[in-house]
Amino acid sequence: MTVQTSKNPQVDIAEDNAFFPSEYSLSQYTSPVSDLDGVDYPKPYRGKHKILVIAADERYLPTDNGKLFSTGNHPIETLLPLYHLHAAGFEFEVATISGLMTKFEYWAMPHKDEKVMPFFEQHKSLFRNPKKLADVVASLNADSEYAAIFVPGGHGALIGLPESQDVAAALQWAIKNDRFVISLCHGPAAFLALRHGDNPLNGYSICAFPDAADKQTPEIGYMPGHLTWYFGEELKKMGMNIINDDITGRVHKDRKVLTGDSPFAANALGKLAAQEMLAAYAG
């Protein structure tokens, strides 16, 4: 007999009217083991350049019916790219807008993954004790050691990052100083921070999570309601081209902006980023 899993969002008792994804959606879109592979970098980078991770610091995303989606950064989208980059020789630092700890979607953590989980435990303190982004931005100059800015996905990237002047300043610095910008899924929502000023990403092409898919997720209880706005629409208004309209694990390179469409792209994006950064900094 087939056991039917519920499509009702699960209550998050830590907050009023807040919900995790349904059992059904978790059964379809999460796994206890990731698809990490291809971590093979025989000549890793040995220098001082590193990655700046701009992480989410808020968990609760309001939906159109007033219910809150319990979110944060998606663990697969965060950890798999970083695993590849770390293996390629690039250390990383974590910053949030507030300087408060990173929020993760722990319901998507690959708890039985024998490579990813030790990596997370090894670096957990960076996520628990991040830098304040404004302090990082104040120190940026042409000689700064950050080789890339990485904005992980998860719906937590929709909260605060698109309105942050510090996010805008960090992205402007990266593009103007020929650094890499890496993101996937909902992470490119952070690019919206550029829409009210100098926008060096105008005309760039990226992969991102499709708005059409976000509009379908409440049907399976992934979110407890519909989003109140859609970041893809807004990115297009600011002159960006989203090249995918579905979720296939696709990645894309436009100059030094490297993007992926979903958690299914996390491993491939990690490979792409590691290869591109090694070519740029260890060649």
Curated annotation (Swiss-Prot):
Which reaction does this chain catalyze? Answer: N(omega)-(1-hydroxy-2-oxopropyl)-L-arginyl-[protein] + H2O = lactate + L-arginyl-[protein] + H(+); N(6)-(1-hydroxy-2-oxopropyl)-L-lysyl-[protein] + H2O = lactate + L-lysyl-[protein] + H(+); S-(1-hydroxy-2-oxopropyl)-L-cysteinyl-[protein] + H2O = lactate + L-cysteinyl-[protein] + H(+); N(omega)-(1-hydroxy-2-oxoethyl)-L-arginyl-[protein] + H2O = L-arginyl-[protein] + glycolate + H(+)
Q: Name one GO cellular component term.
A: cytoplasm
Q: Which GO terms describe its biological process?
A: DNA repair; methylglyoxal catabolic process to D-lactate via S-lactoyl-glutathione; protein repair
Query: EC?
Result: 3.1.2.-, 3.5.1.-, 3.5.1.124
List locations, semicolon-separated.
Answer: Cytoplasm
Q: Has the keyword Metal-binding been applied to this entry?
A: yes
- The main enzyme category here is hydrolase
This protein's record includes keyword Cytoplasm: yes
Which residues does the entry assign to the active site, renumbered to this chain? C185
Q: Which of this chain's residues are annotated to bind Zn(2+)?
A: H86, E91, H123
Keywords per UniProt: Cytoplasm, DNA damage, DNA repair, Hydrolase, Metal-binding, Stress response, Zinc
Which GO terms of the molecular function aspect are on file? glyoxalase III activity; protein deglycase activity; thiolester hydrolase activity; zinc ion binding
- Tell me the superkingdom of the source: Bacteria
| Protein family membership | Belongs to the peptidase C56 family. HchA subfamily.
Function according to Swiss-Prot or TrEMBL: Protein and nucleotide deglycase that catalyzes the deglycation of the Maillard adducts formed between amino groups of proteins or nucleotides and reactive carbonyl groups of glyoxals. Thus, functions as a protein deglycase that repairs methylglyoxal- and glyoxal-glycated proteins, and releases repaired proteins and lactate or glycolate, respectively. Deglycates cysteine, arginine and lysine residues in proteins, and thus reactivates these proteins by reversing glycation by glyoxals.
Q: Subunit structure, per the record?
A: Homodimer.
Q: What is this protein called?
A: Protein/nucleic acid deglycase HchA
